[in-house]
């Protein structure tokens, strides 16, 4: 009897799972499908990565996804043309053409506020050690934007504000994790340094080397890196006050190994800016330029056109001239906008030279079927032959926002 009851419960549980399975699969599919799709006029909506998914009405009524008219439309994606899964936005637009670069560039950025990158205790007149910044609750990575009545736009302004307080409590306005906060800090006199101090080290600027992905010469905008410029000590994305890009050449490379990513080494060739940075965002560095850049004019692929399989990257690992290297796109995903692709380097020349993907190659264009499909963003620390990439379409959208703002 007990055995029969156990079998009955198991059968009932199995039936429940079987009933829930289709809904779970539809939920998974919903989360994987894009929210927006771009098409050329007259181009039908095809999703190669989801061959069984197609727009509703494909077998009957007009398919808005293949309209000839430029504009934005709502499209219902379905399973086999009959079971609705998700409503998405279909944008019909002319395909963009950009100058694909792959050239190195130097970055000089000044942050909005002074970033806390370290702490050091101070010997007080009473003989004990104190740290006013820590006592005020400040942390590594906080961005100080005002002390007292003085805006702390740079390191000198922080020093000036502490001198102005002269040991009195001063209100500190700072930003942590995107949220503005306030606290009170009381500077102490450092007899050894002969100045008022808070016990914190701050940084107001950053410099580095990256790779230029593309330039739109008609709109006068550029895109690079594919990820934000972050502070080397805190890992925090730098809030942009102003910035520029300058000519650069690659002078050396440390090879990447398992657990230790390699790095391109470069030097600035000139102090003359070739572009102004307008955005330091999650999807890269974007700005304006009137400089003519060498490169090949190529169409930008829509996200749904990117395929797994053979591809190429344009990367500069020596000097100023990019070369084409063979890679394989192993995985594609719409779920994480900063990690749309997993790519693997298969080019023997690049593997011999760098060990795979190294720091400084971020922004290297990914090409497939004669189109710009994306850019390299990160290396997998435990496997330097592999890395992540971002869709070129995403970077183009951000660059077009810069162009619109400059009008």
List PLM regions with ranges.
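Hydrophobic membrane-insertion alpha-helices, especially the h-region
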Residues: 9-28
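A short glycine-leucine-enriched loop at secondary-structure breakpoints
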Residues: 129-143, 166, 356-360
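PDZ domains, with a preference for the canonical peptide-binding region formed by the helix
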Residues: 66-68, 146-179, 383-385, 390-393
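Conserved PDZ fold ligand-binding element
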Residues: 133-156, 366-369, 373-378
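Serine endopeptidase catalytic core focused on the charge-relay Asp
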Residues: 184-359, 368-369, 377, 383-398
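Interdomain regulatory linker/hinge segments that flank or connect interaction modules
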Residues: 2-3, 56-100, 278-325
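PDZ/PDZ-like groove recognition
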Residues: 110-135, 139
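PDZ-domain C-terminal substructure recognizer with occasional recognition of PDZ-binding tails
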Residues: 77-79, 86-88, 92-94, 159-199
């Amino acid at each position: 009897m007990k055995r029969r009851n156990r079998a009955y419960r198991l059968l009932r549980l199995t039936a429940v799972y079987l009933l829930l399975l289709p809904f779970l699969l539809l939920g998974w599919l919903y989360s994987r499908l894009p929210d927006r799709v771009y098409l050329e006029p007259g181009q039908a909506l095809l999703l190669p990565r989801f061959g069984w998914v197609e727009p509703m009405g494909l077998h009957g009524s007009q398919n808005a996804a293949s309209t000839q008219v430029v504009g934005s439309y709502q499209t219902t994606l379905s399973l086999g043309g009959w079971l609705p899964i998700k409503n998405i936005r279909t944008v019909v637009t002319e395909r963009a053409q950009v100058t694909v670069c792959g050239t190195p560039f130097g970055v000089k950025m000044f942050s909005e506020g002074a970033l806390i990158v370290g702490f050091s205790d101070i010997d007080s007149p009473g003989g004990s050690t104190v740290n006013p910044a820590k006592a005020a609750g400040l942390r590594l990575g906080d961005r100080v934007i005002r002390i007292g009545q003085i805006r702390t736009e740079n390191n000198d302004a922080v020093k000036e504000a502490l001198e102005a307080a002269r040991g009195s409590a001063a209100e500190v306005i700072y930003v942590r994790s995107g949220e503005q906060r306030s606290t009170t800090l009381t500077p102490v006199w450092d007899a050894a340094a002969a100045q008022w101090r808070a016990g914190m080290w701050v940084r107001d600027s950053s410099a580095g080397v990256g790779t230029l992905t593309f330039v739109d010469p008609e709109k006068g905008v550029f895109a690079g890196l594919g990820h934000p410029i972050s502070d080397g000590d805190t890992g925090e994305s730098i809030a942009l006050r102003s910035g520029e890009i300058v000519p650069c050449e690659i002078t050396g490379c440390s090879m990447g190994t398992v657990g230790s990513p390699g790095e391109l080494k470069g030097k600035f060739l000139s102090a003359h800016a070739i572009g102004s940075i307008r955005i330091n965002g999650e999807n890269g560095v974007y700005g304006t330029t009137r400089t003519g850049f060498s490169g090949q004019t190529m169409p930008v692929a829509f996200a749904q056109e990117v395929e797994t399989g053979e591809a190429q990257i344009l990367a500069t690992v020596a000097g100023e001239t990019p070369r084409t290297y063979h890679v394989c796109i192993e995985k594609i995903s719409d779920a994480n906008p900063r990690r749309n692709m997993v790519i693997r380097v298969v080019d023997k020349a690049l593997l011999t030279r760098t060990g795979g993907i190294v720091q400084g190659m971020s922004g290297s264009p990914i090409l497939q079927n004669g189109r710009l499909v994306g850019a390299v963003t990160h290396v997998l620390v435990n496997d330097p032959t592999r890395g992540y990439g971002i869709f070129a379409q995403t970077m183009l959208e951000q660059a077009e926002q810069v162009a619109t703002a400059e009008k």
